[in-house]
């Protein structure tokens, strides 16, 4: 099925998974003192449309967790709730053991501490599908903007770091270019450098390759693989099953706002138990 079993067998996490500390009891994750992100019983609705119906997920330090599933399954909403770009209606959220505090009505809550929100957002850097670079700024200025403006860091120090991160993603020669002068793959790599320049605890990728053609997609995939090999904590929403198999310590399959199946890549892709997951993998294989 999908011939991913051979693929995942090559990778480090099947020899010794860094996700061994992710424990399951009665279908629920046990909290770990190594965790960066912990979510319990998360619910999110838009009016009468319930998008997340009670999701539990944990990402421990150094783990790469991929969220897969059909469009509309709740993957991107879950990621945006992690970063507090969306407010959930119910459930517990913790960042490095610190519980998010809420105010407001039960089904219309919001975080109560703006400083806590800023602290969490700056430590959970998002990489968006559509890059979201400022068109009027150079690539270097885009990467420097948040650390200087939001974190009030010294501009000269930030510039040195920004140039280093642009070199890291192989576009160090594009510092003075504007987004419109770059290919889609280069823009996404600039967005990754921007996220890294915040020095976050974790990176959150929302479909980082879906807006790219296959050739440009591989440029971004290489960067993500390199980051995974460094042991960075990452949550990745993706339709790219090969990417998920390559880099993940743990894969979560969502269906209609619930976790349908989860496990290490070898199990999820090689021995799926859910009929929905088997169908999803087969469909993804047919498309690719």
Language-model segment annotations:
Residues 214-216:
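Helix N-cap at the start of a conserved alpha-helix in ABC-type nucleotide-binding domains
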Residues 244-246:
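A short, surface-exposed alpha-helical micro-motif characterized by mixed small hydrophobic
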Residues 177-180, 198, 230:
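Conserved signature/switch motifs of ABC ATPase nucleotide-binding domains
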Residues 68-70:
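The feature captures the beta-strand-to-loop junction immediately N-terminal to the Walker
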């Amino acid at each position: 099925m999908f011939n991913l079993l051979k693929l995942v067998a090559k990778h480090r996490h099947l020899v010794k998974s860094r996700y061994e500390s992710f424990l399951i009891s009665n279908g629920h994750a046990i909290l770990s003192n190594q965790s960066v992100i912990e979510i319990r019983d998360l619910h999110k609705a838009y009016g009468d449309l319930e998008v997340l119906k009670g999701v539990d997920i944990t990402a421990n330090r150094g783990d790469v967790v991929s969220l897969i599933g059909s469009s509309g399954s709740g993957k991107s909403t879950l990621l945006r709730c992690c970063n507090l770009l969306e407010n959930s209606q119910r459930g517990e959220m913790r960042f490095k053991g610190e519980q998010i505090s809420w105010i407001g009505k039960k089904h219309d809550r919001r975080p109560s501490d703006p400083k806590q929100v800023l602290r969490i957002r700056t430590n959970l850097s998002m990489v968006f599908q559509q890059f979201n670079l400022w068109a009027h700024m150079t690539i270097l200025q885009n990467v420097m903007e948040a650390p200087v403006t939001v974190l009030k860091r010294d501009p000269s120090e930030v510039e040195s770091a920004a140039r280093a991160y642009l070199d890291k993603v192989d576009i160090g020669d594009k510092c003075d270019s504007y987004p419109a002068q770059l290919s889609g793959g280069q823009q996404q790599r600039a967005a990754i450098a921007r996220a890294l320049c915040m020095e976050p605890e974790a990176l959150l990728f929302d479909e980082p390759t879906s807006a790219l053609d296959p050739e440009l997609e591989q440029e971004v995939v290489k960067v993500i693989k390199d980051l995974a090999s460094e042991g960075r904590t990452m949550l990745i929403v993706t339709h790219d099953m090969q990417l998920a198999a390559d880099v993940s310590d743990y894969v979560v399959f969502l269906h209609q706002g619930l976790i349908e199946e989860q496990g290490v890549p070898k199990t999820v892709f090689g021995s799926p138990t859910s009929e929905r997951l088997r169908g999803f993998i087969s469909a993804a294989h047919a498309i690719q």
